[in-house]
């Protein structure tokens, strides 16, 4: 008789060993403390290269042992370990690698060192920001709606099409809030008659100022003078809110009268250029997820949440106290938050997406938007430096400093990519060290930086993708960085173009030509290095140096090729983007037939539903009514079934008036749980991420017209978090609500 085998996989010897270590009460912390002390001592004393190699291997082993446990203490430990390993590397770089033979070597070597110092500075600041993310949850509103505050919803627009703006306006009009306590305003800097007529037809209010001074900030300031609500919800004209936006977010504004701003994530229901153009795009977290999933939660702990221009609630009293929205820079949002915090106001972040908008369609548009952000943040750094002036706590200063100086990445990024060319083309050794020493000090530093980031970022950002996102725009931002630092008043606000279509596949040469040139030069350098390794008679040190720089150039070339691949723009013909959603519905036709089903995807163009129905072809469509109950509202939506076969039916909406259109908007975009799957991605694994980056390059070599087979992450249910607060007793004996803990520094 055969033995019954366990279905659980056998645990490796390493797993059993590390679990044994971690299971000992307090042992992990003792071992950790001793290990960090030993590492610090090894950094400060002179050890042989072989002994330093042992130190490096021990650090890697400690990472794997401690990293098996998932807890906040583990993350802090790994961040401290990574910082010490990086300090060890920096000590070595400053004391043993700056011995140059020529002025050229010296200049190139110091240039690389400065780039590394910037990278280490940003690494340490990022660890500081994310040391204890707050993970704020919603607070309940008072039971009596009469106690809820009044809210003005501002939707600023300039030259965007009405077809985009109307969805946001209709979504805002559908927000669950007492009708006498909310007003929706279209702030039209384009002064268009069709927008005024639409506002009158749908029940929104319309404000148009006589000029366009100070762009978006001026538009908002003008509206403040002509409205009276206690709070202001700002929505970019393409950010369509869910019905529960105010009920989920306003609890904090009511509970704490010192909160001037509550920011929520920016989520996009359409793919950005990286998602749309790369074969692995839909399996990779969007670029903005790192900021809204990790960094803003970390900022919230330090009371340094940034205002991001949309999907945010602001207290009118706080805005009026600082004289309105900041107009000195092109990023009025972050500057406004900084000014409020200088006045002693608090800010908050709620990591629940309550609205969704359109991502930039084209790569060149994406680059232009980031150039404006970079210009604006560097302007704030120059004209209102957070490290100077009064009113800010240390944590706030450092968080703002990190945000502003992060946009200096362009020059260091170019230096890192190009550095191997100094040796491959000109035999200039810009790190005065043997390849073995580089491996002993640099590789552990890189390993811990990458591996620790993977633990911290989880599924919000994958390893090596930050390099791709930065490299896409680095060569464009070099000039912006230098000019803005020297002349901070230069530059103007540019509206980001959205909502377009791409009728044919094309290669965006405008957005990629600098990196194409860069990649050609890098490939030539690699060929030069390979030629030397294969055909030249090299001594062992030169051979290792060529091998090291060839590996470096291969990594640079992979990043550059991935960046160029994003420029292969795929066709985008849909005006209405499909959104995956599983909604129970019942379909009725006018002959009395009915069937229950589940939606597969929804859009403003129609809906696909899994349901048993007779075969229907486009030549013989069927008029139906789709019945659904969402957030307590019964909906009966008229539609036309244009195709039905094999248990799946496709419908187009039959929108006859603005009331039906508003109901469809609520059905498609207004569901309270519509965007809770926004981070349904697997946790980062660096080697898998590197492989996906290599796979993304194949987009460059696909045949014209060949579609990319995107594989979306599988959906899993996510519960909406609710803050549970126990009442505490004040000194006067009265009950008061407990407050969330955050840094006091």
Curated annotation (Swiss-Prot):
Residues that bind substrate: 236, 238
Required co-factors: Mg(2+)
CDD domains attached to this UniProt entry: CESA_CelA_like
Region (Disordered): 708-745
Family recorded in the similarity comment: Belongs to the glycosyltransferase 2 family.
Described purpose of this protein according to its UniProt entry: Catalytic subunit of cellulose synthase. It polymerizes uridine 5'-diphosphate glucose to cellulose. The thick cellulosic mats generated by this enzyme probably provide a specialized protective environment to the bacterium.
Protein name: Cellulose synthase 1 catalytic subunit [UDP-forming]
Organism expressing this protein natively: Komagataeibacter xylinus (Gluconacetobacter xylinus)
């Amino acid at each position: 008789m055969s033995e019954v085998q366990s279905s659980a996989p056998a645990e490796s010897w390493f797993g059993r060993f590390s679990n044994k270590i971690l299971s000992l009460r307090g042992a992990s912390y003792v071992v950790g403390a001793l290990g960090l002390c030993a590492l610090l001592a090894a950094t400060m004393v002179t050890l042989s290269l072989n002994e330093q190699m042992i130190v490096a291997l021990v650090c890697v082993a400690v990472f794997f042992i401690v990293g098996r446990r998932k807890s906040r203490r583990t993350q802090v430990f790994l961040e401290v370990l990574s910082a010490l390993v990086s300090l060890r590397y920096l000590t070595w770089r400053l004391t043993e690698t700056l011995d140059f033979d020529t002025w050229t070597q010296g200049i190139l070597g110091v240039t690389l060192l400065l780039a590394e110092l910037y990278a280490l500075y940003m690494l340490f600041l990022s660890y500081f920001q994310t040391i204890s993310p707050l993970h704020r949850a919603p607070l309940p509103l008072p039971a009596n709606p009469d106690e809820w505050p009044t809210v003005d919803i501002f939707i600023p627009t300039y030259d965007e099409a009405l077809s985009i703006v109307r969805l946001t306006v209709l979504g805002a009009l559908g927000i669950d809030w007492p009708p006498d306590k909310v007003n929706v305003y279209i702030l039209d800097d384009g002064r268009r008659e069709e927008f005024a007529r639409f506002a009158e037809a749908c029940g929104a209010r319309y404000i148009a100022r006589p000029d366009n001074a100070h762009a978006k900030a001026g538009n908002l300031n003008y509206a403040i003078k002509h409205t009276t609500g206690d709070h202001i919800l700002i929505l970019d004209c393409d950010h369509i809110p869910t019905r529960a936006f105010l009920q989920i977010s306003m609890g904090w504004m009511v509970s704490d009268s010192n909160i001037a701003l509550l920011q929520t994530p920016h989520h996009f229901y359409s793919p950005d250029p990286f998602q749309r153009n790369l074969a692995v795009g839909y399996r990779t977290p969007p670029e903005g997820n790192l900021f809204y999933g990790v960094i803003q939660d970390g900022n919230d702990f330090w009371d340094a949440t940034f205002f991001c221009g949309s999907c945010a609630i602001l207290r009118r009293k706080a805005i009026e106290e600082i004289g309105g929205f900041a107009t000195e820079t092109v990023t009025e949002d972050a500057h406004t938050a900084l000014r409020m915090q200088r006045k002693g106001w608090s800010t908050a972040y709620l990591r629940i997406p309550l609205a969704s908008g359109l991502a930039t369609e084209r790569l060149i548009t994406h680059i232009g938007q980031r150039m404006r952000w970079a210009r604006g943040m560097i302007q704030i750094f120059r004209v209102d430096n957070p490290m100077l002036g009064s009113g800010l706590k240390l944590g706030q200063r450092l968080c703002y400093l990190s945000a502003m100086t992060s946009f200096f990445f362009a020059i260091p990024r170019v230096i890192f990519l190009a550095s191997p060319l100094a040796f491959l083309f000109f035999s200039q050794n810009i790190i005065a060290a043997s390849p073995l020493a580089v491996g002993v000090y640099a590789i552990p530093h890189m390993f811990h930086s990458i591996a620790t980031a993977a633990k911290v970022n989880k599924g919000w950002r994958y390893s090596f993708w930050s390099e791709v996102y930065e490299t896409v725009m680095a060569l464009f931002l070099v000039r912006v960085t230098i000019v803005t630092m020297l002349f901070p008043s230069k530059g103007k606000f540019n509206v980001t173009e959205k909502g377009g279509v791409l009728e044919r596949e094309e290669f965006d040469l405008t957005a990629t030509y600098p990196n194409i040139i860069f990649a050609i030069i890098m490939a030539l350098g690699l060929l030069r290095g390979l030629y030397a390794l294969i055909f030249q008679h090299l001594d062992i040190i030169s051979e290792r140096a060529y091998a090291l720089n060839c590996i470096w150039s291969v990594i640079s070339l992979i990043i550059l090729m991935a960046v160029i691949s994003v420029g292969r723009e795929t066709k985008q013909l849909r005006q209405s983007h499909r959104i995956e959603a599983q909604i129970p519905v019942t379909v009725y036709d006018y002959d009395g037939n009915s069937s229950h089903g589940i939606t597969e995807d929804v859009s403003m163009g129609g809906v696909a539903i899994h349901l048993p129905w007779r075969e229907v072809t486009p030549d013989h469509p069927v008029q139906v009514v789709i019945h659904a109950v969402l957030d307590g509202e019964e909906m009966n939506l008229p539609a036309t079934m244009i195709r039905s076969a094999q248990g799946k039916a496709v419908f187009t909406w039959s929108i006859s008036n603005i009331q039906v259109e508003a109901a469809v908007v609520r059905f498609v975009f207004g569901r309270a749980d519509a965007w809770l799957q926004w981070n349904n991605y697997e946790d980062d694994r660096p080697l898998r991420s590197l492989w996906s980056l290599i796979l993304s390059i194949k987009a460059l070599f696909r045949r014209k017209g060949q579609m990319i087979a995107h594989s979306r992450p599988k959906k899993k249910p996510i519960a909406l978090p609710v803050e549970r607060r126990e009442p505490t007793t004040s000194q006067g004996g009265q009950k008061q609500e407990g407050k969330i803990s955050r840094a006091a520094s």
